[in-house]
A protein has these predicted regions:
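N-terminal cationic and glycine-rich segments that engage phosphates or anionic surfaces
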Residues: 1-125, 130-139, 208, 249
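Positively charged, low-complexity, intrinsically disordered RNA-binding extensions
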Residues: 139-249
Length: 249
């Protein structure tokens, strides 16, 4: 099972804990505001905003919160001005780490992320150092209990998806970013509810980690995930599923 989808599954299992800390809503509000700022406040003509609203509703965010986040993005309401950019670095064993950042204070965020890397066995890298190791893909994770392989394969192919992979307890659908919405809609129309879905950065190759290096990498991932300005963490580690599930527990 590939590292990025294993970690996505772990994050899904830990979602209730994250929600208690308010981090899910904070990140979704930032994403909605930036999407509205960059592409306008109409979700019908702004695919990124449409996806952010779908994600917010899936987490039971109140409609008023969504509306205010859109209005802050379009400038109809006052609020913080967010900047989005990527940060790159390395974990133990030369594992690549790519971060999606949304922040209202670049200097503060860069300093804090640099500290998180250094404290947890990693180090920051220059722009472009690891981003070339990843490519953008639509990534839809579905529990095997929710769909049979043949049925799901037919849906994926008809909707324009690229691949259907066996990831242990789950099926993983990969799409081109342009086909992501159509494939996700087709899956849901068939009555299948994904465990998670997003357009994400997927590594081209993976680095196997075991023992102390694996534990250090998990600590680094958790430290980065904890930061309020980090929207997403992408990495090319491959760590045993059992160890990751112990962390999720």
């Amino acid at each position: 099972m590939s590292g990025h989808s294993k970690w996505a599954t772990i994050k899904h299992k830990k979602g209730a804990l994250d929600a208690k800390r308010g981090k899910i809503f904070t990140r979704l509000i930032k994403e909605i505001s930036i999407a509205a700022k960059n592409g306008g406040g109409d979700p019908d003509s702004n695919p990124r905003l449409r996806g952010a609203i779908v994600a917010a509703k899936a987490e039971n965010m109140p409609a008023d919160n969504i509306k205010r986040a859109i209005q802050r993005g379009t400038g109809e309401l006052p609020g913080a001005t967010y900047e989005e950019f990527s940060l790159e670095g390395y974990g133990p064993g030369g594992v690549a780490v790519l971060l999606d950042i949304n922040t209202d204070n670049r200097n503060r965020t860069v300093s804090e992320i640099r500290h998180a890397f250094g404290k947890n066995g990693g180090n920051m890298a220059e722009a472009g150092a690891v981003s070339w190791m990843f490519h953008k893909k639509g990534d839809i994770i579905i529990p095997k209990t929710a769909a049979k392989e043949d049925d799901l394969m037919n849906i994926v192919l008809e909707a324009g998806g690229d691949d259907l992979n066996d990831d242990g307890e789950n099926w993983e659908i990969l799409t081109e970013p342009s086909a992501f919405e159509a494939v996700l809609e087709a899956v849901k129309k068939a009555g299948i509810e994904p465990a998670s879905s997003s357009v994400t950065s997927i590594p081209q190759n993976y680095i196997k980690l075991e023992g102390a290096a694996a534990n250090t990498m998990i600590r680094l991932m958790e430290a980065l995930e904890e930061h309020d300005d980090v929207q997403n963490v992408h990495s090319n580690f491959d760590i045993d599923q059992k160890l990751l599930e112990e962390v999720a527990g």
